[in-house]
Amino acid sequence: SRGLGDVYKRQEQQYKVTAYDVKIGKPSPEPYLMGLSKAGVKANEAIVIENAPLGVVSGTAAQIFTIAVNTGPIPAQALIEAGADMVFPSMPDFANHVDELIHTLKITR
C-alpha cells in the first residue's frame, strides 16, 4: 500500500521521464509506460494527472487511471472526450479531493 509520501519519493531523478527519454512522445503511451517501468509499478498501481488532451490520451493508452485537471482554456468536455476517468475544474478543487481519491483508489484496487 502506497501513500502520498511515496508519490513525493517517486519524483526523484531516477524516476523522471522527459521527452528526451522516449522515441515517441504523447499521445503515445510510451512516456507513461517508461515511467511505470522506472518506478517498478503496474498500471493499476498508478495514477496519471494531466491537464491536456494529448496527455490524457497517453495516460489512458497506457491503461492507467487518468485524472484531468482543467488548468487553462481547454473545455472540460475535451478532456472527457480524450478519455479522462475523472475531471476536476481546477488545481485547488483537485487538491481538496486528493486524500479522498487516495482512500477510494486504495479500496478499489
What are these regions (language model features)?
Residues S1-Y8:
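Short, small-residue-biased leader/transition segments that mark boundaries at the very start
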Residues G5, Q14, N44, D85:
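Conserved acidic residues
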Residues K9-K26:
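Histidine/lysine/aspartate-rich catalytic loop segments that bind and position anionic ligands
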Residues Y20, N70-P73, M91:
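Short secondary-structure boundary segments
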Residues G25-P53:
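Conserved Lys-Pro-Asp/Glu-containing loop-to-beta segment of HAD-superfamily phosphomonoesterases
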Residues I47-M86:
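Acidic, Mg2+-coordinating phosphoryl-transfer loop and its flanking beta/alpha structural elements
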Residues F94-K106:
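Short amphipathic alpha-helix with an adjacent loop that forms part of the alpha/beta core around
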